[in-house]
Amino acid sequence: MRLKGIFKEKSSTGKLGILFLLMVVSVILHTLLAQAVIVLFTDITLIAVSMMQFTSQSEIDAVKFIQMLSAIGLFITPTLLYAYLCDFDLKLILNFNRQSLLLAIAIMLLINPFIAFIYEWNMSFNIPDWMLVYDDNAEKITNSFLKMNTLGDLFFNLLVIAIIPAIGEELLFRGYLQQNISQWTGKPHVAIIITAILFSAIHMQFQGFLPRFALGIVLGYLFYWSGSLWLPIIAHLLNNAMAVTFSYPTFSDYAYLTENTATWQQAFFSFMAVGLLVFLLQKNLSIKKD
């Protein structure tokens, strides 16, 4: 039986339901697989992992492993299966020129003061305590993950925190959602905004909602202008990889480059510099299309 494109003629609502079902089933199976591996091949109990006491490096690594497979199960596997079953074009292999890639990288390097300023503003909001529980748990996990002693820890973190999320989240949010919302509404800019909202909301970190939303807007326009997922994937990867790399003791002197603090003057110049780079990027891509 030929499965490729079997759901191609389904309605947009039906296809969305198929993707949601694939995501639920996939993340459950991947999480169960990760837990089974831990139980069978380590001395760590799932109770210890679920309590998140992080009393040893092995427990931290176990949580990283579960998070890695869960992320693959939530973002990568279902989106690729959906693309196969619905014959959906993810636009993953379209070419882009070197200048566009360099401009996208420069944007991510220069945008941090502006994002940091938004983060501080978001932190000033009066957020209910029940919401802050999610932020506290996320901060606890992140701080535990970023305690690295060896190059092996650094490379594992780059895989779990940078590479897999960059590929998986961009496949789902820009590769699928943004394209489909744009088709449904006929308004690509609205699609970018809605996708950025969903992108930020799924992380369940309310004190970081606005900066992640702003990042989602940038990633959305990188995809919209270039027509290739590789630009937002590389930009997303760079953003996460800098935070991981500068937390490693050898590179900790550069941690200020990713700090969540910035003056309004720094934010202003960051915004203006990024605006100029965005203009150059759009112009560069327009010339390429012509």
Predicted regions located by residue number:
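Interfacial transmembrane-helix boundary/kink motif in multi-pass membrane proteins
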Residues: R2-I28, D61, D87-F125, N260-F271
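Structural signal for the C-terminal ends of transmembrane alpha-helices
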Residues: L80-D89, L222-Y224, V278-S286
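Alpha-helical transmembrane segments in multi-pass membrane proteins
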Residues: H30-L85, R98-A106, W130-M131
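Functionally important transmembrane alpha-helices
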Residues: S200-T261
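Hydrophobic alpha-helical transmembrane segments
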Residues: E59-L74, K140-I164, W264-A273
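Membrane-interface helix/loop boundary segments of multi-pass membrane proteins
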Residues: G168-I194, Y221-S228
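C-terminal membrane module of polytopic membrane proteins
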Residues: F7, L237-D290
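Juxtamembrane helix-loop-helix connectors linking adjacent transmembrane helices
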Residues: A48-T55, K91-I164
